[in-house]
Curated annotation (Swiss-Prot):
The name this protein goes by in its record: Mediator of RNA polymerase II transcription subunit 20
Assembly information from the UniProt record: Component of the Mediator complex, which is composed of at least 21 subunits that form three structurally distinct submodules. The Mediator head module contains MED6, MED8, MED11, SRB4/MED17, SRB5/MED18, ROX3/MED19, SRB2/MED20 and SRB6/MED22, the middle module contains MED1, MED4, NUT1/MED5, MED7, CSE2/MED9, NUT2/MED10, SRB7/MED21 and SOH1/MED31, and the tail module contains MED2, PGD1/MED3, RGR1/MED14, GAL11/MED15 and SIN4/MED16. The head and the middle modules interact directly with RNA polymerase II, whereas the elongated tail module interacts with gene-specific regulatory proteins.
Biological function: Component of the Mediator complex, a coactivator involved in the regulated transcription of nearly all RNA polymerase II-dependent genes. Mediator functions as a bridge to convey information from gene-specific regulatory proteins to the basal RNA polymerase II transcription machinery. The Mediator complex, having a compact conformation in its free form, is recruited to promoters by direct interactions with regulatory proteins and serves for the assembly of a functional preinitiation complex with RNA polymerase II and the general transcription factors.
GO molecular function: protein domain specific binding; TFIID-class transcription factor complex binding; transcription coactivator activity
Biological source species: Saccharomyces cerevisiae (strain ATCC 204508 / S288c) (Baker's yeast)
Pfam families given in the database record: Med20
Length: 210
């Protein structure tokens, strides 16, 4: 089973990405396609919710993971997709679907806007994908409507063995380039279950909670 982690370097500059790539240059085996990510925060407008229920919900769209969108609310996750190819043909045939699905974010911002209000959109476009020995490192600069937010690093390994050591290696390179203030998450959504895309989305939430 694979493992993943997310590192967010808030006190970075847009040039930090290039500096980290240069620090990794001797370990890079190949460079893959660019990637992008959308991270949205929604706030529930319903009043009088129980004190132990958060009003925040997060939407993470992984354009590099089959364009799947994962909703994270408290410790629960839901995986959605807006890809027409993922709709069962039977639903189109019997009229249950038009075959042109709306994204969950479109539904939240239109049909459910009286319940969920988007507070923030953070985007990362044209990120770098670096292949190292047993580790995929994805780097992207994040921006919001207010400007540059920081550097995000997504780590993925096919094998769980020595994954913490690999994370420590990346953190060591961050220290080399004097990027010392960062947040790392390799948490799982649930200790007794494992779903790679849901765990990855949860790690984004844990790392990007601002």
């Amino acid at each position: 089973m694979g493992k993943s982690a997310v590192i967010f370097v808030e006190r970075a500059t847009p040039a930090t990405l290039t500096e980290l790539k240069d620090a990794l240059s001797n370990s890079i085996l190949s460079v893959r396609d660019p990637w992008s990510i959308d991270f949205r925060t929604y706030r529930c407008s319903i009043k009088n919710l129980p004190a132990d229920v958060s009003k925040l919900m997060y939407s993470i769209t992984f354009h590099h993971h089959g364009r799947q969108t994962v909703l994270i609310k408290d410790n629960s996750a839901m995986v959605t997709t807006a890809a027409a190819a993922d709709i069962p043909p039977a639903l189109v045939f019997n009229g249950s679907s038009t075959g042109v699905p709306e994204s969950i974010d479109t539904i939240l911002s239109s049909k459910l806007s009286n319940i969920w209000m988007q507070r923030q959109l953070i985007k990362g476009d044209a990120g770098e994908t670096l292949i190292l020995d047993g580790l995929t490192v994805r780097l992207v600069n994040l921006f919001s409507s207010t400007g540059f937010k920081g550097l995000l690093i997504e780590l993925q390994a096919d094998e769980a063995g020595e994954f913490e050591t690999k994370i420590a290696g990346i953190e060591g390179h961050l220290a080399e380039i004097r990027a010392k203030e960062y947040k790392t998450s390799s948490d799982s959504l649930g200790p007794d279950t494992s779903n790679e895309i849901c765990d990855l989305a949860y790690q984004y939430v844990r790392a990007l909670e601002l």
